[in-house]
């Protein structure tokens, strides 16, 4: 199941994530790491339990959780772990995480991992962080603005803003472009970018 997370570009999500995101900055003002905590919905979490509970005890032990983390690390690599970062309009590539830690609590799969830029990236001008699935198969939600944070030295000199686009307004403003062909593009669409909650940092 996990290897098939973003199987197609459907117009509505099938997997739901309650997420927390933290931009950690180094003393020199560069991005140290992007910390992610993902809590999956109960339906998807149950399917993961069915797939990985080799012991048949209705839970996931350390070995099984390690297998879950490895599967996610491998399967989401081609999707950039749903992480999209731009610095003054230029994309910032992210390196593959060293590992993804998986846990299973109260019927929910929880993934914790950190990403680092492939090259040293300083917070200068406008840096935008978006966590979203371009295929629209998975919905990533940040319940409050405090779930997208900035820490480290840059937190004192930079301004942080969480942007939550209104889907209805986005549809109205882009009505001509949002055709059925647009949504059926297997490579994903710009619509996910238009409606995704994002963290904007001005330095």
For each feature predicted by the language model, list its residue ranges.
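N-terminal signal peptide c-region/cleavage motif recognized by signal peptidases
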Residues: 6-8
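Short beta-strand segments of immunoglobulin-like
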Residues: 21-23, 100
């Amino acid at each position: 199941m996990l290897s098939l997370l973003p199987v197609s570009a459907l117009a509505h999500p099938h997997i739901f994530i309650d997420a927390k995101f933290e931009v950690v900055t180094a003393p020199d003002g560069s991005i140290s790491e992007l910390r992610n905590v993902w809590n999956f919905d109960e339906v998807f979490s149950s399917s993961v339990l069915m797939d990985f509970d080799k012991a048949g005890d209705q839970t996931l032990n350390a070995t099984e959780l390690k297998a879950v983390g490895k599967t996610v690390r491998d399967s989401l690599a081609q999707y950039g772990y749903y992480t999209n970062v731009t610095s003054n309009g230029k994309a910032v590539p992210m390196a593959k995480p060293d590992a993804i830690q998986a846990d299973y609590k109260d019927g929910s799969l929880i993934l914790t991992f950190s990403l680092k830029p492939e090259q040293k990236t300083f917070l200068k001008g406008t840096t935008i962080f978006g966590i979203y699935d371009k295929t629209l198969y998975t919905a990533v939600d940040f319940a409050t603005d405090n779930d997208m944070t900035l820490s480290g030295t840059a937190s004192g000199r930079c301004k942080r803003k969480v942007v939550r686009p209104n889907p209805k307004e986005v549809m109205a403003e882009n009505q001509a472009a949002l055709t059925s062909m647009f949504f059926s593009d297997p490579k994903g669409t710009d619509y996910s970018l238009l409606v995704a909650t994002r963290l904007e940092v001005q330095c």
